[in-house]
Amino acid sequence: MLFGYLVGFLAADPEERMTSGGKRVVVLRLGVKSRVGSKDETVWCRCNIWNNRYDKMIPYLKKGSSVIVAGELSVESYMGRDGSPQASISVSVDTLKFNSGSSRPESRGSDEGRQRSNDNVSLGFEGESLDTEIALDKEVYAGFGEDQQYASEDVPF
């Protein structure tokens, strides 16, 4: 099982669907910023919220909302419009949180307001907390550019 945390912005309002078996699923399209060298890229992920989980949060999720998603990751393949093979990332959502920190300047409040709103941010596991204040003054990226160094024994392949 591959489990991960994603921080990003919703590309559209949540979409409610029903499977052929009658199960309810709410689909979020999440754009996650990443940086490769000096080039910024957005990775698009489909996040599936099954049954009635997070029903009280879903009405507050809108296009542009910044969220933190944790769950089981999978890679799915499909044929593109031009007939070439494509891949997409899908997440079966286990934890969903509003991200009070945002890299969008228009959505930032005062430093004092941001600090108060970050006091109770958690990752969804007992005893673990997320210190978002450190990341608030940086762009929300999977990595912070080329200054990350890895020893060869750290790379799993």
From Swiss-Prot:
Gene3D superfamilies associated with the record: Nucleic acid-binding proteins (2.40.50.140)
UniProt xrefs under InterPro entries: NA-bd_OB-fold (IPR012340), Primosome_PriB/ssb (IPR000424), ssDNA-bd (IPR011344)
Highest taxon of source: Bacteria
GO molecular function, one term: single-stranded DNA binding
Keywords, ordered alphabetically: DNA-binding
Pfam family, one: SSB
Domain (SSB): residue spans on this chain: 1-100
Skewed-composition ranges (Basic and acidic residues): 105-117
Range of residues in the leader sequence: none
Region annotated Disordered, chain positions: 97-126
GO biological process per UniProt: DNA replication
A cellular component annotation (GO) from this entry: nucleoid
PANTHER family (UniProt xref): SINGLE-STRANDED DNA-BINDING PROTEIN
HAMAP family noted in UniProt: SSB (MF_00984)
Subunit comment: Homotetramer.
Entry protein name: Single-stranded DNA-binding protein
